[in-house]
């Protein structure tokens, strides 16, 4: 099994000419812990259970004025699996399924941002989401392969863009 901690901090700014007049920028901090527990591990097949707890802090400025300041907390649990054919012309199939429960807290944001959210997207509060993925890679030669994949997510309400 593997237990870990992750921390990141970055600053963003919008550089497109379409948004230059906004001077949009801000810092984003993220911290979390994760646990990965192998369930099955053979030469061909691998299955593991993943659990993640993450908190994010966002601050968005428009024209040097703070427009929004909010947090996002997320607990995710799920399964990651893969299988591989070990013969020549081999292939690999992988899948993942993660169930998450989270919370967006806008209480430190401006009144304008909270009111706009309440009148439109309504992202504040708790949410649940299910993320899934399935991929298959077929190898033809050492240098040539074909990859087909599908990924998606379902949520019980509108999500913040960070989710």
Name the predicted role of every residue range.
Residues 1-89:
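Gram-negative/organellar outer-membrane beta-barrel architecture
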Residues 59-163:
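C-terminal outer-membrane beta-barrel translocator/porin domains of Gram-negative envelope proteins
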